[in-house]
Design a protein with these regions (language model features):
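N-terminal secretory signal peptides that target proteins for export/translocation
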Residues: 1-10
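Structured catalytic/translocation cores of nucleotide/phosphate-coupled proteins
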Residues: 3, 26-28
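A detector of low-complexity, intrinsically disordered, Ser/Thr/Gly/Pro/Ala-rich segments
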Residues: 7, 21-23, 38
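Hydrophobic alpha-helical segments, especially transmembrane helices
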Residues: 9-13, 31
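Surface-exposed extracytoplasmic segments
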Residues: 29-252
Length: 252
């Protein structure tokens, strides 16, 4: 059993019940109502722990589910180039699944990385019972990896688990430039958005049709994240019912 010292955890809990059955998987999934990018000074100074979003949605075929954990907000295209920005090999990334309705993880998928740059590799363990339950835990299960290989490569099979880890365009939509004009004390300390005024210069978001998807590049500033994407049979996560809760943690 392996340990990392100086435990620090970022968690994103999916807190509201999705009102639509995910028919492709037969699951009801709990979902988040919020997204956070550089939401504290601590994660802005430690961007590898900045978990921006967690997603769960039907997979590429019936009976499959896709899970996504995005981190390291506001990467520029240059920073997201192959081998430039790496996952932190001192961190434990986890998808946690509650399939009994008690808001505690019943299954986890653990992801760790080794090395950096273009030669970085990934190991995925699970889904399995958690070695330890709770947010402030970074114990890596003492089991063989389910999948392993190089980052920025699709690993696994379409009938079992498939994994991709690497830079991708941030899928979250927000008129971030206007947000920082409304609340300038939340703007980043580096990068193009740091050049916005230090005092409020707007009082509301732009009208529909005029809003700019800054993260998607509509304003000339395309941003990326480091994504961990896992697709697998939904039966591997399901409990006695078809309702699951999914959240993510990043622990040091």
């Amino acid at each position: 059993m392996h340990w990392h010292n100086n435990i620090r955890t970022r968690s994103r809990m999916w807190i509201a019940i999705l009102a639509v059955v995910v028919t492709a998987t037969g699951l009801l999934v709990k979902r988040s109502l919020a997204s956070d990018h550089q939401d504290t000074a601590d994660v802005e100074l430690n961007p590898s722990m900045d978990m921006t979003d967690v997603y769960a949605f039907p997979g590429s075929a019936a009976g499959r589910i896709a899970l996504v954990l995005d981190s390291w907000a506001l990467l520029t295209p240059a920073e997201a180039a192959p081998g430039v920005t790496s996952f932190d090999d001192n961190l434990l990334y986890q998808f946690k699944v509650d399939n009994t309705g008690d808001a505690q993880e019943d299954k986890v998928i653990q992801v760790t990385f080794h090395g950096s740059g273009a030669d970085q590799t990934i190991e995925v363990r699970g889904p399995m019972a958690p070695p330890v339950v709770g947010a402030m835990r970074n114990t890596v299960a003492d089991v063989a990896p389910t999948l392993s290989g190089k980052v920025a490569t699709v690993l696994g099979s379409a009938s079992g688990m498939q994994v991709f880890a690497g830079p991708r365009q941030d899928p979250f939509y927000i008129d971030l430039e206007q947000f920082f004009r409304i609340i300038p004390d939340r703007k980043p300390v580096t990068g193009p958005l740091s050049m916005l005024p230090d005092t409020p210069s707007a009082s509301s978001f732009r009208a529909p049709g005029a809003a700019v998807d800054i993260l998607g590049g509509s304003g000339g500033h395309p941003f990326n994240v480091l994504s961990i994407v896992i697709e697998l049979p939904a039966s591997q996560l399901r409990g006695s019912t078809d309702k699951i809760g999914v959240w993510g943690t990043i622990s040091r």
